[in-house]
Amino acid sequence: MYPIIKKEKLADKIYLMDVKAERVAKSAKPGQFVIVKIDEEGERIPLTICDYDEKAGTVTIVFQTVGASTERMAYLEEGDTFQDFVGPLGCPSDLIEEDIEELKKKKIVFIAGGVGTAPVYPQVKWLHEHGVDCDVIMGSKTKDLLILVEEMRKVATNLYVTTDDGTYGFHGMGTNQLQELWDKGVRYDHCVAIGPMIMMKFVCKLTKELGIPTVVSMNPIMVDGTGMCGACRLMVGGEVKFACVDGPEFDGHQVDFDQAMKRQLQYKTEEGRAMLKLQEGDTHHGGCGQCGGCLLYTSPSPR
């Protein structure tokens, strides 16, 4: 069992938890994720690692309640436990694999949307600790949904906060802020965008026009974390990739976002059905088609 050491509500329906998971904390690197499961009846929930403390043996996760499984997580309190806390999974951020001196020569910008701020934070923190400067553009729909602003301010070289409704910081979206900086003569050599699919799509559209290489962290539904079920497959550069083993980071200019968003919408619908089952006291496992593992490609039958 993996006990919850700390729980904090960051914003409406957004929570932070520190979980005691010594092995995961010892091996974790920025960009990786874990898959958690509350109990035997719980679904497997993929969550990017927000932070980790090797000495304390804790891993920090941030999640938003968007369906049945995350709604159950929100009811957990300090002292409660997860049955499974599997990780670290996925490949670490490409940036931490690069030569530090070469990184210092680059002008790097992170663009975080909503809960996407959580997986951006450990990367920016790691770069800061290694003497690498980077700017961060982080935003949300409104001021009350902003998270980790002060934490990010401590590690970012320049922090630009945006809100869609203008209640805090720059009035507009992250792409608007990037365009304004570009118009003022600010140039970037590398961009990392993490957030909702639609946000990453339009960031990549802009950065492609501006000629800025861009990495995105894909977060479609992941189930087994090994690539066996096929739930997290996407098209990248015309090839099938699996977010849980090949990613979660990919070249944003090569990702087929339209196909990825179509798949994500399908799972949101099924998650909604799962919410109804939970509220009615019913659980449903196996043979439901949620993971995509039973999908087959067949040739037309001969006539």
Regions from the PLM with identified roles:
Residues P220-P248, G286-G293:
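Local cysteine-cluster metal-coordination motifs and their immediate loop/turn environment
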Residues G42-I49, L89-E97, C244:
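Short, Lys/Arg- and Gly-enriched loop/turn segments at beta-strand edges
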